[in-house]
Amino acid sequence: GLTGVVAELDTGRPGKTLAFRFDIDGVDVTESKDEAHRPFKEGFRADIDGITHACGHDGHITIGLAMAKLIAQNLDDFKGKFRFIFQTAEEGTRGAVPMEQAGVLDGVDYLLGGHIGFQAKTSGGIICGTNKLLATSKFDVNFTGRSAHAAGAPQEGANALLAAAQAALAMHGITRHADGVTRINVGVLRAGEGRNVIAPNGYIACETRGETTELNEFMFQKCMDIVAGVAQMYGVQYDVKLTGGTSGGDSSEEITDIYERAARQSPFIKDELIVRDLNFGACEDFAHFMHAVQKAGGKSGYLMIGTKLAAGHHNGAFDFDESALLSGTDVFLRSAYAINGKDA
């Protein structure tokens, strides 16, 4: 992505290449103007309606910049190389794949990442190892039929509205898989031009998810079978456009161990709020990075940083406890010392 940034610090001493990933994009939400909303009250509400940081990625940017500054200021304490990946387009799972293809993970031995909030809902808490990040495919289907007079010559038409509707219903009827979690959702259906016109166009926006990459592929292929069958049934053409996607993933045990030790040493984390590992049950395209690093023989892990939230993720009133910035930075920095400290 053109808005992504990658920076590297080289100590000049032999060691591992340790990368950190921080997602930086906003979401399509208008931020609250309620007087009780702290960002509005204190004058740092989003400037543009319809787009805001309602998922905590501004916090991730802050942690990433703090990490880069602290490691640069204390470079003599370290060995090896540090790479800071500020990733665009996590929302919609569109950013990791092109950045990985651009080579941002080349030579990486360890990759660390995480997120503010989600299941870590208490300030001072942490989830050290996040597992079962779901694989997903995001795709649009356009059906192209043929318009005709609905009463005078319906036989001359090819109804793309019915094709889109039939596809949506059939996709939601796909048999789930016994090997793990699978999901399907058709979130948008648009079609037609007029009440007395056979609809020449139909559009659906869809996503599949699976506990593993293989389970997601099972769901996606079933959807493709349905699209092809429905198109033949109604005599329409179709076009499928992949708009995003990511692999599934589990944190490496070694990274979970490192995070847990760092959390127990941190003055910003409460021991009773440390959770060793938890299944995520949702999608995050860090999983693509994680899978790529692990496939190449490296280690990767994803943590969740505890914070009290004013409202849920992707809500216009979203706000987090800024003590999470200290917690996240401290755990990542201690993990950096554990992996690439001079005495590690």
Regions found by a protein language model. Give the residues of each.
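A non-catalytic alpha/beta surface segment that caps or lines the substrate-entry region
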Residues: 1-14
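Histidine/acidic-residue-rich, glycine-tolerant segments that coordinate divalent metal ions
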Residues: 5-6, 27-29, 40-41, 45-52, ...
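Structural motif
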Residues: 15-17, 136-138, 298-302
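Short, solvent-exposed beta-strand-terminating loops
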Residues: 25-35
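DPxDG-like acidic metal-binding loop motif
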Residues: 61-68
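Metal-dependent amide/peptide-bond hydrolase catalytic core
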Residues: 161-344
